[in-house]
Design a protein with these regions (language model features):
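Short S/T/G/P-rich N-terminal loop/turn motif that feeds into the first structured element of a domain
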Residues: 1-57, 65-75, 95-96
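Conserved short beta-strand edge segments in small beta-sheet-based binding/regulatory domains
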Residues: 81-96
Length: 96
């Protein structure tokens, strides 16, 4: 049973990168996330898109799992690759 959460949030895609951003989230990024899950780093995830509200947080995902495994995931090269790629596509990216 999950006792912790890893938050990955963003503002919006960089102008002109909208298609690339959503393709990444729906294909390569999803494949990477599924591999992290298969490797036991987290138990489940949720994706959330927010309606327009004038703020700078417009979408996020939550990875649910055990704190030690989520901490371990954050230190893997594969997760760093995922975050760095997402950071080239999404403005205001943050991982907490």
């Amino acid at each position: 049973m999950a006792t912790a959460v890893l938050f990955i949030g963003w503002n919006r895609p960089y102008p002109g990168r909208e298609g690339d951003a959503f393709r990444f989230l729906l294909s390569e990024g999803t494949e990477m996330l599924e591999k992290f899950k298969a490797d036991g780093f987290y138990e489940s995830r949720e994706h959330v898109g927010l309606t327009a509200h004038g703020g700078d947080l417009n979408g996020f995902m939550l990875l649910f799992g055990e704190r030690a495994k989520l901490d371990e995931l954050r230190r893997t090269d594969a997760f760093e690759k995922f975050v760095m790629r997402l950071g080239t596509l999404m403005n205001g990216l943050g991982v907490i």
